């Protein structure tokens, strides 16, 4: 994906997320659709795709259907795909002017590790560089990737001033319900998720 210059310009956060999945060998054989359908709460591509408002094209015995990315994963290792269905394509929307996206994750090692928590943000600026539209998604902090509308509402109509960003942070922290394991405590994941979302915005 990183070789597609138009895609990198339009959706740098999605491309960044995809390039963090596995090694070069894995990326040469696998797809971001596979990363989505693996249904891991910590999947790198999913927060970026949710923030981007991506759609998936599904084919199966009943024909072809289209749905939002957030409708695919229903729980850890579980999807809404029916028997015989596969994801044929992931479709990103046209990019409005004055828009950008970003994906950030925290991992204990430098590469090929599972995210302790992650955040994807996509936003569009309006007149006077005021935030017009935004979507915020968090990974590895709940059984599925979480879209956080309250975090988006916290910064719409602002110029990303400190007060607005702190409200976004608080909304992200409130949306977290992570597990407690050797890679991070509940409190740690919750705090870092808010920090990542603020930085991505």
Feature locations, PLM:
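C-terminal structural segment of proteins
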Residues: 1-201
């Amino acid at each position: 994906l990183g070789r597609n210059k138009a895609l990198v310009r339009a959706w740098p956060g999605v491309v960044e997320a995809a390039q963090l999945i596995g090694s070069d060998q894995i990326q040469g054989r696998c797809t971001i659709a596979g990363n989505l359908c693996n249904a891991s709460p910590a999947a790198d591509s999913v927060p970026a795709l949710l923030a981007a408002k991506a759609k998936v094209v599904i084919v199966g015995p009943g024909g072809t259907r289209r749905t939002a990315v957030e409708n695919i994963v229903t729980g850890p290792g579980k999807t809404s795909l029916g028997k015989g269905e596969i994801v044929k394509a992931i479709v990103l929307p046209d990019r409005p002017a004055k828009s950008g996206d970003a994906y950030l994750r925290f991992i204990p090692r430098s590469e090929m590790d599972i995210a302790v928590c992650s955040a994807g943000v996509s936003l569009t600026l309006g007149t006077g560089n005021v935030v017009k539209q935004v979507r915020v998604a968090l990974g590895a902090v709940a059984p599925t990737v979480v879209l956080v509308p309250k975090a988006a509402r916290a910064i719409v109509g602002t110029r990303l001033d400190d007060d607005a960003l702190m409200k976004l942070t608080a909304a992200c922290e409130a949306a977290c319900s992570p597990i407690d394991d050797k890679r991070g405590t509940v409190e740690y994941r919750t705090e870092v998720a808010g920090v990542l979302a603020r930085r991505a915005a």
